[in-house]
Curated annotation (Swiss-Prot):
Signal peptide: none annotated. Component of the KEOPS complex that consists of Kae1, Bud32, Cgi121 and Pcc1; the whole complex dimerizes. Its EC number is 2.3.1.234, 2.7.11.1. Gene3D superfamilies: 3.30.420.40, Phosphorylase Kinase, domain 1, Transferase(Phosphotransferase) domain 1. The keyword Lyase does not apply. It is an enzyme of class 2 (transferase). Pfam families: RIO1, TsaD. The keyword ATP-binding applies. It comes from the Archaea. This is Probable bifunctional tRNA threonylcarbamoyladenosine biosynthesis protein. GO terms for molecular function: ATP binding; iron ion binding; metalloendopeptidase activity; N(6)-L-threonylcarbamoyladenine synthase activity; protein serine kinase activity; protein serine/threonine kinase activity; protein serine/threonine/tyrosine kinase activity; zinc ion binding.
Amino acid sequence: MICLGIEGTAEKCGIGIVDSDGNILATCGCQLYPEVGGIHPREAANFHAEHIVPLIREALEESNLSINDIDLVSFAKGPGLGPALRTVATAARSLSQNIGVPLIGVNHCIGHVEIGKLTTGAKDPLTLYTSGGNTQIISYESGRYRIIGETLDIAIGNCLDQFSRDIGLGHPGGPIVEKHAENTNKTIELPYVVKGMDLSFSGILTSAINKYKQGVDLDVICNSFQQTCFAMLCEVTERAISYTGKNEVLLCGGVAANSKLRQMLQVMCEDHYVDFYMPPMKYCGDNGSMIARVGLLSYDENKCGIENSYINPKYRTDQVEVTWIKDNFQHNINLPDNIKEKGAEADIIEGIWDEREVIIKHRVKKKYRVDKLDEKLRLERTKEEAKLLSDCKKYGVTTPYIYSIDLNRKDIILEKIDAPKLHEIINTDKDIKKIFTNIGEMVFKMHEGEIIHGDLTTANILIKDDKPIFIDFGLGKYSNLLEDKGTDLLVFKKSLNTIIPEKSEELFNYFLNGYDNEDVIKKIDEIEKRGRYL
């Protein structure tokens, strides 16, 4: 079967032709460059209307095929700009009817993942998807691509574009910022915001624009802007590696064209003993071949036809039932013998201290971060974590005892506790309702004491005698804001949805039974909606 795919979710218009053996027969495309400002949805729609037919002709010529050789037409139904999506869907309907072949709409984001897997050979990667409209950490789990981390406000691509536009450099901003950043090694401090496996770019955007207005050198701002944003992306990705245990990382999306981001992710992956993949540059950005590929993978006669060809501008990656992945993948990361676990920001090492068996949490230097930022983060987090672990006990929340702290090495020497992690006992015969209610009660106490865990996942809660023991406060802080408490709960909710999606709602409700604050619970939905594609 041969599929022709039509892409046009934003400013890029693309046609791709792919066959069912995975051969990419043609990839053709063009891009709208606005004279001023960003992408206007109607301008994008008009641009696509003008270029789709010529690009189809070009793709057929490149593939040495005629239009009658096409067996299936697929199109990007979302997420994206409404007017642009409608133009693409109209073109796809017309083409499929004219040549008498099935029509199927597909998810744009999953297209990036699948073309990446096809062109790199990655089997079951953790995917960092970075584009103008999306920033997501994606993992295939239990029949869907799950979003285990994402931006809580604007996407990295939009962040770069908006900075460039606001200071008068034009659009698209990514290549412009990258070019200026290459002119210097100097950096300044900018906001660094990571919340579990989620992140936020609005603060750093505002700060960078203000620095420019204050007269700070443009090259220095651009280098700092890139280094800080990309370090945040690397950190949430390594947190996801630690949580999922996957041994492959795939970078995709338009921002993957940035050489500094690729370099930083490569370094991070090497330090975590996992493989790094990135598709050829022509398949990083939006393209028709990724739409054709997903069209073939998801082809189902019952899902085809004009009646199913509606668009969805807010089409989430995790809304799609992934029926084409059948394998049950096993992952193995080969760690050095002296490392018990490789955490996101620390090596976990077993040792002896004062004739006691202990756990040494050693915050290792992050080679992907600039030295000054890395030293600051590791020192601050080591001191803050030690204080939070100790203060939790004031509110009846169980944490490991601290025996010693070495701020020079960024080490915390902790009580060794022989107990399974929460995700290891979820499918056992233990009283799960009681356990999750207990966790909710303890997190409520923590929050009443104005302690925010910061990375509240099932990997950071030990269970002993049906009671929780909280570990790893590396992203923790003191706060009484509903926003921070709600984010804590959202991180926990997402972690459940990743590891046990079929029971996640039930388990989270048990948790909420113990968490006695309706205002915080209501805040979860508000924060969650910000991650939707806009």
